[in-house]
């Protein structure tokens, strides 16, 4: 366990955060933050799905088989961004699960 210095105003405002102790409160803050990041990823993923009319796995297949012009700058950029959002979504889900396990058990 590590010790950290926290400003008094932060400690005072922790009263508004759900949790029975500081560890639970910090964990809840992290889950809340990860959930916001997850929502942003899912919104970005949805925009790509709406733009291309398919999910990322299907788009990847179309990209790999040449059904879409993989050398077009916009498509290549979209592929990389979409892939990044999918990876980030997975990391956020994993982090949320881990944090919730800490609260529950």
Q: What label would you give each PLM region?
A:
Residues 67-76:
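Charged, acidic
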Residues 75-105:
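Short, compact, well-ordered microdomains
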């Amino acid at each position: 366990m590590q010790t950290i210095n926290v400003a008094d105003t932060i400690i005072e405002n922790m009263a508004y955060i759900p949790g029975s102790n500081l560890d639970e409160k910090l964990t809840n803050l992290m889950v809340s933050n990860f959930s916001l990041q997850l929502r942003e990823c899912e919104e970005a993923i949805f925009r790509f799905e709406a733009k291309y009319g398919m999910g990322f796995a299907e788009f990847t297949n179309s990209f790999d088989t040449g059904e879409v012009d993989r050398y077009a700058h916009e498509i290549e950029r979209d592929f990389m961004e979409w892939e990044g959002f999918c990876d980030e979504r997975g990391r956020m889900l994993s982090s949320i699960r881990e944090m919730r396990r800490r609260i529950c058990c």
